[in-house]
Amino acid sequence: MPAARTVARSDARGRGRHTLMRGPRTRRTVAVIGAGLAGLRCASVLQAAGYAVTVFEQAPAPGGRMRALAGQQWHCDHGAQYFTARDPDFMSAVGAWVANDCAAPWLARLASWDGSTLQPSRGTLQRFVGVPDMAAPAHALAVGLDLRTETRIDALQRTEHGWALRGAGLPEAVPAELLVLALPAPQAAALLETAASDLARVAARVRMQPAWAVVARFTAPVEAGYDGLFVNAGALRWIARNSSKPGRVGAETWLLHATAAWSHAHRDATPAEVIDQLLPELPALGLPAPLACEALFWEAASTESPAVADACVWEAASAAGLCGDWLAGGKVEGAWCSGTALAQRICAYDAGGRD
């Protein structure tokens, strides 16, 4: 391996300096850890370019924070709530998702709350959601990929020919020539700490914020005067009527997201304690007492500003890279652009750029 350690980055729009998607001269193996949108996008581009790609995901299904909670006759998006599209490549992808009925525009009535006044939002930004839930685009992107769910990678080891991956669900070490980590920054830093310290330091510089999510179920439709509410006072920061999104069926469900500060202060609380403390916020926001609630804690829900301003990071010396929304401004579109950018860096590296 080269003695110099070069950490190369691409711009935050996800295009990078190299846009030619030329594959390797031989069919090289790539291990992608994390099946959120960034990992799936990176994997799909690399596979189309001729790489042999395997994606490892510790959860039962792909999607990352594009996920929904479900029970008997109800379900609710409890992570990412919607996405927008500005990047031309991502706009094209969203158009394809809409054409294939796995996404649709969300014509939501949005408002904001400052603690005393409910103010309707009059913006024209178009928002999209997955159909029948936010995980649908990730499931569509995973089609045709070698995806190993319920497989947690616990250890990485450098080898003469690349990498060896070990973890729960793997009877033996899995070899790979190239490595992609599509994980939240703290997880990536911990996994790379001894195997690729330069990459680990990049991830360790990023601080991510937690969020408590509460799914509230009601016996009948609730008319609060809005479908999505940006809350600028109190413990909550966002409320959404999940049932207002296209393709949703079942019981009336609403999603509550707590602020990062409140979530951090209550990170050790039980779900029942969180529900008890957040429900008193609802009457002022026009919501009645729910029939039942579920609560879930997101350890890394968003990136604390300032975030790393690069769409991806590639370390040629270790043949490993990082991608994720936290590298490209956050949000669903950022995840897509980051995955694209890293795939481009890898293709350029194998095409002879070696940076």
Where are the language model's segments positioned?
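N-terminal Rossmann-like FAD-binding beta1-loop-alpha1 element of flavoenzymes
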Residues: 28-55
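Glycine-rich FAD pyrophosphate-binding loop
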Residues: 47-71
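N-terminal FAD cofactor-binding segment of flavoenzymes
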Residues: 68-110
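Short beta-strand to alpha-helix junction loop
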Residues: 82-86, 118-140, 268-274
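A conserved short coil-to-beta-strand element within the FAD-binding core of flavoproteins
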Residues: 149-163
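Active-site substrate-recognition segment that forms the wall
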Residues: 215-267, 273, 277-286
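Flavin (FAD/FMN) cofactor-binding core of flavoprotein oxidoreductases
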Residues: 282-318
